[in-house]
């Protein structure tokens, strides 16, 4: 029941935030850009962390673990290259991810592409998302230090790294 209520609440908030965002962007003549909505969502998740037991702590269903290349995942749901904020990654691990693959890391720090870089995509009544973020990141040296110090190891689940390069 908690899952259903949180799902309905999430959809309502997502709909409301994106529509208000688009309204203000239209009023001020700014290109449509979903990135402020994503930042709002991340900040909201982080700021209600005191409700973590109620909202975030989901028990991973029993007998749903999976083994891949001698690595044991507590769930077959794996977060792949979608966030780099440690607070947000911790929340997703609490919600039952079986493992995590960090965003692509490049040798040097990168800012990524200029905004707008996230937009809705609609094609023949199918909805999607255009993503042109452009691999922003802290660079490999800073990332390795972060990886050593991260508290994500406490979950004892596989952590992967996507490594990129320039041609």
Q: What are the functions of these language-model segments?
A:
Residues 163-167:
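Active-site glycine- and acidic-residue-rich loops that bind
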Residues 2-158:
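N-terminal capping/small domains of soluble enzymes
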């Amino acid at each position: 029941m908690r899952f259903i209520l949180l799902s309905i609440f999430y959809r309502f908030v997502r709909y409301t935030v994106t529509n208000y965002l688009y309204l203000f962007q239209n009023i001020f003549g700014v290109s449509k850009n979903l990135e402020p909505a994503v930042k709002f969502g991340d900040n909201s998740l982080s700021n209600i962390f005191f409700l973590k037991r109620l909202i975030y702590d989901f028990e991973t269903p029993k007998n749903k673990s999976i083994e891949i290349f001698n690595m044991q995942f507590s769930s077959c749901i794996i977060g792949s290259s979608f966030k780099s904020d440690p607070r947000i990654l911790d929340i997703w691990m609490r919600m039952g991810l079986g493992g995590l693959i960090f965003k692509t890391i490049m040798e040097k720090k990168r800012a990524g592409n200029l905004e707008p870089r996230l937009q809705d995509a609609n094609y023949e009544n199918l909805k999607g998302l255009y993503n042109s973020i452009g691999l922003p990141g802290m660079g490999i040296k800073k990332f390795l230090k972060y990886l050593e110090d991260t508290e994500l190891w406490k979950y004892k689940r596989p952590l992967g790294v996507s490594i990129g390069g320039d041609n």
